[in-house]
């Protein structure tokens, strides 16, 4: 249905959005590629719209496009938080997490590390698990991805859980 609506109206944000969700798997992603390429242009002020295309780009191994989508998603959320005078915890850490992963897939380890550093800095600046569960879960996902994707098992020793945080299940094994 979403693709039918999108084909009739390529400026329909919901049609593009739902097509991306519906075909977010390696075998089906190509069906939503046009939606993915268009969605960010339809809703330029939406950090979610800027990021969503990355779901299709990642499935298709389009890492440069995934990086661009997630950079745009992150920066759009940062600007929105500033403009609305919101706490840092409202920034789009999902885009940041996917940007980190995309850099790892490209072998751009220094860039991935710089993204992980943003996450760590924000956590030190007052984002805690009680005020924002989302931000915290991405810390552990990023750490786990860094260790697994680079096979640098010693990384875990350099990043004990931040004060007040409990490791998530997928990070606990690495700490032992």
Q: How should these model regions be labeled?
A:
Residues 1-50:
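A conserved hydrophobic secondary-structure block that centers on an alpha-helix together
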Residues 22-23, 57, 103, 147:
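Residue at a conserved register position within TPR or TPR-like alpha-solenoid repeats
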Residues 12, 46, 85-88, 92, ...:
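Residues that mark the junctions of alpha-helical repeat units in TPR/alpha-solenoid scaffolds
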Residues 28-29, 63, 109, 153:
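TPR-repeat structural position
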Residues 6-8, 37-45, 75-86, 120-131, ...:
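Solenoid-like repeat scaffolds
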Residues 16-19, 50-53, 91-92, 96, ...:
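TPR repeat positional signature
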